Design a protein with these regions (language model features):
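Catalytic machinery of carbohydrate-active enzymes
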Residues: 1-355
């Protein structure tokens, strides 16, 4: 039996993107056992993966600070011996813990995030498609002598209980078999990545004019939930999912959708990892950085028309404040044009429904 230790603590989308790689590594290496260091909230991403153990460090108490990180190293070392350590996060915390492992004689392999080439793209605005994050993860395993070929979605699984709960809810909201089930995820962590609720209202109206559809609203914290409740009131066929279900149930529900329309956000990743058609809307960030919806056609990436802005992309993750009062890049994406694109792409068609 071979054991390896893998680190990826955050963020939500980045942790989700480890799933295709870890699942495939486990599938193709029957003797391998993986311990993944991550956060408890992300546990549903890894449901059903055999020989995978999740470990949740207590970074607020027991494993806080330098002494705490050394304690984390000691706690993890007791779970070994590990053949190798794979750091898919490469931040100060993981660098410290992996340093202790390296000093104890355990080989450590760290992700190459491509920071220099990403920063060069921001500085020069010369756009090219960089390696996808999942491939960077796979390459890190390759450094450790574990080759992996990422397969096709769906990658994320869910429990029977989550499926039954989600299916019951969804079918209760769908009046007819040939009704489109569309997920909407209007929010992201930063303003330059948000299209705006008024645009979504207009898009809902346009779709309702020509299609039988039901819309399900995903994502958002406490502040965003209040805004999503207002969006829910826009039409009787719009239903708020966020805040009502567990993450496992949301994953199961996403899998049943015909289409997800999302920002550059974790729900974009969850939908594409679930094998659902995913339309992603990009403003201040850019899919070329390697965080695009995995397995989705380039045509599904909605971006501002070229030639109007010289400031895009402004940052890798959208954390840099926009130089304009409101993100001009998002204002250039019109609901009418997005609707036309959906029609052209032929994505407004419901999947066959089995009773």
């Amino acid at each position: 039996m071979k054991k390896i230790l893998v680190f990826r603590l955050s963020a939500m989308g980045d942790v989700a993107l480890t799933v295709p790689v870890i699942r495939k590594v486990i599938e193709t290496n029957s003797e391998l056992h993986i311990t993944l260091i991550t956060r408890p909230f992300f546990a549903p991403f890894f449901f059903g993966i055999p020989r995978l153990k999740l470990y949740f460090p207590n970074l607020e108490e027991r494993h806080k600070g330098l002494k705490g990180l050394y304690r984390l190293f000691r706690d993890l070392k007791k779970m070994g011996p590990f053949e190798s350590i794979i750091d898919l996060h490469s931040v100060l915390r993981t660098k410290m813990v992996t340093f202790f492992f390296r000093m104890s004689g355990t080989p450590v392999f760290t992700i190459d995030k491509g920071r220099a080439e990403k920063n060069r793209m921001i500085r020069t605005k010369k756009i090219k498609t960089l390696q996808h994050t999942t491939q960077r993860y796979a390459d890190t395993f390759l450094k450790a002598g574990i080759p992996v070929q990422i397969g096709k979605a769906p990658y994320i699984d869910y429990s029977t209980e989550a499926f039954q709960s989600s299916r019951s809810y969804l079918l209760g909201k769908i009046p007819e078999k040939d009704t489109l089930k569309i997920g909407l995820s209007p929010f992201a962590n930063n303003a330059p990545k948000i299209w705006g609720l008024e645009n979504f209202k207009e898009l809902i109206t346009l779709i309702n004019k020509n299609h039988k559809a039901v819309f399900f609203l995903f994502g958002g914290g406490e502040k965003e939930l209040k805004l999503l409740k207002k969006l829910e009131q826009h039409s009787e066929n719009v239903h708020l999912v966020a805040g009502k279900f567990t993450l496992s149930e949301e994953i199961a529900m996403i899998r049943m959708l015909d289409l997800m329309i999302a920002m550059d956000s974790s729900n974009m990743h969850l939908a594409s990892l679930s094998g659902v058609k995913t339309i992603s809307i990009w403003g201040g960030t850019h899919p070329g950085f390697g965080f695009s919806a995995i397995g989705q056609p380039v045509e599904y990436q909605i971006q501002p028309p070229e030639g109007f802005l010289t400031c895009r992309p402004c940052s890798v993750f959208g954390g840099k404040p926009c130089i304009y009062p409101t993100p001009s890049c998002m204002e250039l994406i019109k609901a009418t044009e997005l609707y036309k694109r959906l029609v052209t792409l032929n994505v407004l068609n419901p999947k066959p429904r089995n009773e």
